[in-house]
Curated annotation (Swiss-Prot):
Keywords: ATP-binding, Chaperone, Coiled coil, Cytoplasm, Nucleotide-binding, Repeat, Stress response
Region C-terminal, residue ranges: 766-874
Stretch list, region Repeat 2: 83-147
Keyword Endoplasmic reticulum: no
Organism: Brucella melitensis biotype 1 (strain ATCC 23456 / CCUG 17765 / NCTC 10094 / 16M)
GO MF, one annotated term: ATP hydrolysis activity
Lineage: Bacteria, Pseudomonadati, Pseudomonadota, Alphaproteobacteria, Hyphomicrobiales
Domain Clp R: 3-147
Domain of life the protein comes from: Bacteria
GO annotation, biological process: cellular response to heat; protein refolding
UniProt comment concerning the protein's domains: The Clp repeat (R) domain probably functions as a substrate-discriminating domain, recruiting aggregated proteins to the ClpB hexamer and/or stabilizing bound proteins. The NBD2 domain is responsible for oligomerization, whereas the NBD1 domain stabilizes the hexamer probably in an ATP-dependent manner. The movement of the coiled-coil domain is essential for ClpB ability to rescue proteins from an aggregated state, probably by pulling apart large aggregated proteins, which are bound between the coiled-coils motifs of adjacent ClpB subunits in the functional hexamer.
Gene name for this UniProt entry: clpB
NBD1: annotated span: 160-341
Protein name: Chaperone protein ClpB
Subcellular location: Cytoplasm
Amino acid sequence: MNIEKYTERVRGFIQSAQTFALSSGNQQFTPEHILKVLIDDDEGLAASLVERAGGRVGDVRMGLQSALEKLPKVSGGNDQLYLSQPLAKVFSLAEELASKAGDSFVTVERLLTALAMEKSAKTSEILSAAGVTPTALNRVINDMRKGRTADSASAESNYDALKKYARDLTEDARAGKLDPVIGRDEEIRRTIQVLSRRTKNNPVLIGEPGVGKTAIAEGLALRIVNGDVPESLKDKQLMALDMGALIAGAKYRGEFEERLKAVLSEVQTAAGQIILFIDEMHTLVGAGKTDGAMDASNLLKPALARGELHCVGATTLEEYRKYVEKDAALARRFQPVFVDEPTVEDTISILRGLKEKYEQHHKVRVSDSALVAAAMLSNRYITDRFLPDKAIDLVDEAASRLRMQVDSKPEELDEIDRRIMQLKIEREALKVETDAASKDRLQRIEKELSDLEEESAELTAKWQAEKQKLGLAADLKRQLEEARNALAIAQRNGEFQKAGELAYGTIPQLEKQLADAESQENKGSLLEETVTPDHVAQVISRWTGIPVDRMLEGEREKLLRMEDEIGKRVVGQGEAVQAISKAVRRARAGLQDPNRPIGSFIFLGPTGVGKTELTKALASFLFQDDTAMVRIDMSEFMEKHSVSRLIGAPPGYVGYEEGGVLTEAVRRRPYQVILFDEIEKAHPDVFNVLLQVLDDGRLTDGQGHTVDFRNTVIIMTSNLGAEYLVNLGENDDVETVRDDVMGVVRASFRPEFLNRVDEIILFHRLRREDMGAIVDIQMQRLQYLLSDRKITLQLEDDAREWLANKGYDPAYGARPLKRVIQKEVQDPLAERILLGDILDGSLVKITAGSDRLNFRPISGAFSAAEPEREDEKA
């Protein structure tokens, strides 16, 4: 016996059989040991051959058990194993059988045949008793081999290659495992047309990710099963190749190629009956490529060109261009079929077709309006993905969220149960008390507990009943789907009696039961059982941060009072606050142009009048966070080449992979305020980039991604024309100098840029009477800083007036006041705190002196109400 003539699998089995013999205490290595490890193998090649040859695997195992128990056992021996005469004959016969069949290696099936043929071996008797004959085994082996010989040490891994490395889509379609494919008739027809050609009959489905390329292949499988295809494709098998399984575990050089050749050989042997579907077709290029080895695409080319291999590929536009088009010889063997993104209307039809599958899976109902909302909202707000995939995901997640709520305890019941627990704890504490008041309280608690427990039991029963009702509806849907699948199979197989029973008996009965179950509307139901547009909108809001869900009463009031809220932070600029508020209200009411940003404004005015502060106040109002905005200081973009910092460097330049400051921020958070500060400082070319943003609400970054700006508020600030605004009188209207200011603005910016901005807002200089309110705002901020030390500031009216007068400078706005407060309030306070004059928890009264402020600390008078953080008010 030459062990090198045996395949790796057989060598492994011989080794396992030796280990088994030693562990059993047998000194002789017999055929029974070999058959035992062959039959118990996980992959089950031997067991499968026995079954296919008409044998009973259970009987083989029982016979083996009996034979192995009769073998002589030795304990305390020297672990020496001797080859028995029958096993030597079995090995010799296996080598002879392999040689006659033209095999270079002895394989598992040849060894099994030898075990059945060798009369001196007990295994022949066992297999014969279980109904296995050598003739039947040879017939099954020839069917499995399909004329191939064992030319390598890993020959067994190539048997039934299609079963191992491909999935039968037509079989899945027959079993009803595939989702229905709605629409896409044109693409499926075009695919069938290419498949019906004589040569190069290989379509490749090319389209963006998520448009339904794989669904078209599944649609083709469904059509083949239903017989809705031309004669040339009738009864064909559509097999989806699993590239991962092909490559996985191919350790040795040439093993991957061997597996792929085995797959191709099976497809070719089927004489055109098998169509191979290769999803992510670009993975063929370079798959299995090592030094000197051929990759998968080169192995496929000859068969593709001759028309021996029917193949349907699917890949994205980008990957087709990147991998397949570079290999012209591979590209010419495929005929492209372009798959476009479906329209919103088509997506709604697709969702309606899939609705039942999702209802059955999540055990909730999905309203038709939720499907319409999913298609429309995903199309509008999720711009970096494609229909129908993103709409299907929305419905799936909305149904999943609702199912979680159904499985959780209802809020009403949860509150009662918590109250019961609280009262039980109180009752136990009162039981040890002996006074009359405690006894009285105990009686009241007992009564309340009994009422609450009764209510809890009632609500729990109601909740369980509602859950059960939902489960029943889902169960009926599943039975209905199974019945419809059975009807389709019966019609295909010509079993008309069974089809009649299903079509006119079982299915109508199930439909009636389902309609009855769904029509029982529960008044005052504890559970929400239907996915509505609101649920879909909530999911969109979670994904993108864009508030598309229905406004709650509180938010409506807040939006209507927006001017007052922002006015608490921005003083004296009523027109600007009003313009911003109107834009936000338009957007939240759904009345803004869907293809433009929520609002785009240029704020013009002298320094320190609140241009940047208004932007911060808006961000704080919308997101409860001052920092929820992208602030871009345009003084950093003075050179022409700095444009690439906004949108990302083009290919070939350093920093290409990093993306742009502006585009990356908006891609990550599509709903936010964007502030371009001091816009006149930027290079004129920067404004060219903004033209598309202001007009169409989109911008293409350096990597070719389209970034959506339709949910942003764009604010640009500038000091242009400030000299006219500064010289205005206290009570003069800003409109009187608008023409002068606009003249300066037009000289700096191009008409096409100014024409795209929604509104140019002029900020007038601050009036003297505005200063008091600004002092209050600044002092509030200082108070917030001191809140950790529990120090309360009490600013008297005279001190307030003193600060307002000293900090007022019409040319510089509110910034001088900030400096005055720093010098006259913060500096003295800091010194007094460090000296220990002002202790933690003190109240400090601030009054005005002749040339400075006076601070009078009153110890231990800290105000219990912690000061409200100023930016939380907005």
